[in-house]
Amino acid sequence: MSLLQKLDHLPAFHYAVRLLRVRQLAGFALRKFPRVRSLPATGARYRCRYMETLLLADEIFNRNVYLKAIDPAQVKTFADLGCNVGLFAVLLADLTKRKDLTGLMIDANPEMIGETRWHIAENKLDRVTPVFGLVGSQSGGESADFYLLPSNLGSSQFAVYEPGKPPKGEWKKIRVPRVDIEAVWLKNCGDVRCHVLKIDIEGSERDFLQTEKKFLQRVDTVILEWHKWIVTRETVEAQLKAQGFVLVKVLEELAQTGIAWFQRK
């Protein structure tokens, strides 16, 4: 566990952050002077304009939590659900060394989609499409409620705070478009396989696996983060098993979350 990760799990750290307005001050500084980094193998670039992006960059590029689940030679297409600022696309560009990566980056936080667009453009990933909206909603309408937090991590269709951590501010309810991922995939990527599907949608994973079975039929590898205060790993594992996937490995498990790798049989 990295230092950043340890701090993120200390309630005293979060109370100090709120009391001293560290997030606001650090966010202001990073937006004025973003931290831009290039990955050594390919020069793929990413930037940190938010405190939370430092945590994500540590998870993806330093702790390499997704690395074992990705076979670079077998990845040309992907979908990232709950893409946040878009770092997963940067990782795939670096690992595969492909400029013709084709995929979808979906998030229901409009500010995160703006940052994702920067990462796509900066790395010349012309076949990767950012999509604003919500997947995994049981709502029957064209839009659904979504709840934002001042922190760019944890926004969800469920206004439920993560146990064991102090609240990172008040929830703000917005309406966002519902995304039919199969239709959006066909429109932007074509009738092709999805080699890697990453799911990190803050508790909506169970509903997504229930409502998007047609899209899942075209998926080969699933990397899924589950959120224990909303859904158990056993629940999502059973759902994926029913759709032809097997659990290969739990890549990481913490007190309230975990990341698992599933492969089509």
List PLM regions with ranges.
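Phosphate/nucleotide-binding beta-alpha loop and adjacent structural elements of enzyme active sites
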Residues: 1-265
